[in-house]
Structures are given as structure tokens and as C-alpha cells.
């Protein structure tokens, strides 16, 4: 019996595509097709290794094939954290998955109880946790904004209920709830 592995060529490349590189699943962060005046066309990519988290710049000759990564993305709800692991539950089957600090990474500061996250599994184990694109968090510490103080940077640091620190407008006060984009870590709006 022959096992046929799925492959992608450089024409299939787009951000978010997962493939195998040096025996490790990777995801394309950025890609650009380059046709130089002389020589063969190539695709310039920035990839992130899903297990080690390393970000690399890799060039592929036009038409090169890569093996698809056998990874699975699941929408799971964040449940709780103990000393070593973060626990996520499938909303329909109630199956639990535990992710270590390497898999959670920077997502820790955006995890709220019951927030739906995307967990990437490889060989049945979580290797990556992606929080929701937007979260609503309470401001627990920030400098008071002085009325009329609009000179300068136009923002101030604020510590949120999860421990994350983001730059917010001067009018934001302690106790207010704000919406934050988890992909960039930037303030989006005040929640009414």
C-alpha cells in the first residue's frame, strides 16, 4: 500500500499555509513572489516553526514542492491553568487538551475564561495556541489622564486584568473595559 502525502508548490503559498520544513511543521507568516531581471523567479517567505517558535526567512525556487504538515486546528474553550499547563475543552465533546508554556507562548496574556481559541495539534499534542483576534479586558492600572494634556505621544501605558500592558489614549481610566487586538497588542476601542 502506498501512502500519498499532500504537497504544495510555491504557487500555493499564502500566509497561514502549514507545511513541513526540516522535519518540523511550519507556517508561512509572509510571502512574496520575486522575478528578478536575470535568473530564475523565486518565492521569498518568512516562516515560523510551530514547535520551536523560530522565525526564519527562506527562499524557494519557483515551482518547488513542499510536504503539507499533518496538523489539525481545533476551536477549543480555555478552561483554567495550573502550575505547568493551560487546559482547553472541546465545546461539544468536552474532551480536554493540555498545553505547555511553549505552546501557549505570548497568548497567555490574552486568555480569558471560556474564550474560544484555536489550538494546533501535531501528532495529537498541542503545539500552538492562538487567542481570539479581539478581547475585552479591564484596565487595572494606568496614570490619570490630565484634562487638556494632548501634547506629546498621545498615549500612556495601561496594565490590564491579565497582566498585559498596552498603550491607550489619555482619556482611559482605571476600571474601564477596553477592546484589544491580540494580533498586534494594540488598543482598539473603549467598551460601552
UniProtKB/Swiss-Prot annotation:
Transmembrane segments: none annotated. The modification N6-(3,6-diaminohexanoyl)-5-hydroxylysine is found at residue 38. InterPro entries: Elong-fact-P_C, NA-bd_OB-fold, Rib_uL2_dom2, Transl_elong_fac_P/YeiP, Transl_elong_KOW-like, Transl_elong_P/YeiP_cen, Transl_elong_P/YeiP_CS, Transl_elongation_fac_P. GO terms for biological process: peptide biosynthetic process. The keyword Protein biosynthesis applies. Pathway: Protein biosynthesis; polypeptide chain elongation. One of its GO terms (cellular component) is cytoplasm. May be beta-lysylated on the epsilon-amino group of Lys-38 by the combined action of EpmA and EpmB, and then hydroxylated on the C5 position of the same residue by EpmC (if this protein is present). Lysylation is critical for the stimulatory effect of EF-P on peptide-bond formation. The lysylation moiety may extend toward the peptidyltransferase center and stabilize the terminal 3-CCA end of the tRNA. Hydroxylation of the C5 position on Lys-38 may allow additional potential stabilizing hydrogen-bond interactions with the P-tRNA. GO terms for molecular function: translation elongation factor activity. SUPFAM superfamilies: Nucleic acid-binding proteins, Translation proteins SH3-like domain. Involved in peptide bond synthesis. Alleviates ribosome stalling that occurs when 3 or more consecutive Pro residues or the sequence PPG is present in a protein, possibly by augmenting the peptidyl transferase activity of the ribosome. Modification of Lys-38 is required for alleviation. Belongs to the elongation factor P family. This is Elongation factor P. It comes from Mannheimia succiniciproducens (strain KCTC 0769BP / MBEL55E).
